[in-house]
Amino acid sequence: MDIKLKDFEGPLDLLLHLVSQYKVDIYEVPIVEVIEQYLNYIETLQVMKLEVAGDYMLMASQLMLIKSRRLLPKVVEHIEEEDLEQDLLEKIEEYSRFKAVSQALAKQHDQRAKWYSKPKQELIFEDAILQEDKTVMDLFLAFSNIMAAKRAVLKNNHTVIERDDYKIEDMMASIKQRLEKENVISLSAIFEECQTLNEVISIFLASLELIKLHVVFVEQLSNFGAIILRKEKK
């Protein structure tokens, strides 16, 4: 199965995206939740056999250290632990400022380029806004959290034999058929019925394709809420 997703520019870019979902000051975000979402994203890439760059793995090991120390009983305050968290948040804040400046400069460059040359036409589905201001990466991050929960359930089922012959076209047809009957379904409900991780992945990719083609419509009422598929646009 050949899968292509637009990646973040680096681990700090991913962390900034996760932190920004909370709509609060960087230093007030629930750091353990952010770490868990980052690790879920990395694990999902690995399950889907997508390449994970070394700097992402290095950051993952650092985040796991922070998380483990956070979850330990606090008999004595760990100054080193606080330093690790503070250093991480400062790096995210610094990257946020750098990215804002970079985007402003890029916008100015694009404006000037309009006067001197024909704009280059690009079609990048992986970074496209789908519906309700949701991008493919927004849905993928939500999916990675669901995937983590599903992996935990399947680990307790030792009788399941993995298949690798799920066809995206078949899954698309199955989702459309179900929507004909129910009009509205949540991806979580569909995933609960899956017996293997390959089946979960295939259904997710089929959903993305249906959304891209505007055959079904996607809705997510909150940043970390359920992913809802609708037969008709709300």
UniProtKB/Swiss-Prot annotation:
It comes from Streptococcus pyogenes serotype M3 (strain ATCC BAA-595 / MGAS315). One of its GO terms (biological process) is DNA replication. InterPro entries: ScpA. Transmembrane segments: none annotated. It holds the Pfam family SMC_ScpA. Component of a cohesin-like complex composed of ScpA, ScpB and the Smc homodimer, in which ScpA and ScpB bind to the head domain of Smc. The presence of the three proteins is required for the association of the complex with DNA. It is found in: Cytoplasm. Signal peptide: none annotated. Belongs to the ScpA family. Its main location: cytoplasm. One of its GO terms (cellular component) is cytoplasm. Participates in chromosomal partition during cell division. May act via the formation of a condensin-like complex containing Smc and ScpB that pull DNA away from mid-cell into both cell halves. This is Segregation and condensation protein A. The lineage of its organism: Bacteria, Bacillati, Bacillota, Bacilli, Lactobacillales. Keywords: Cell cycle, Cell division, Chromosome partition, Cytoplasm.
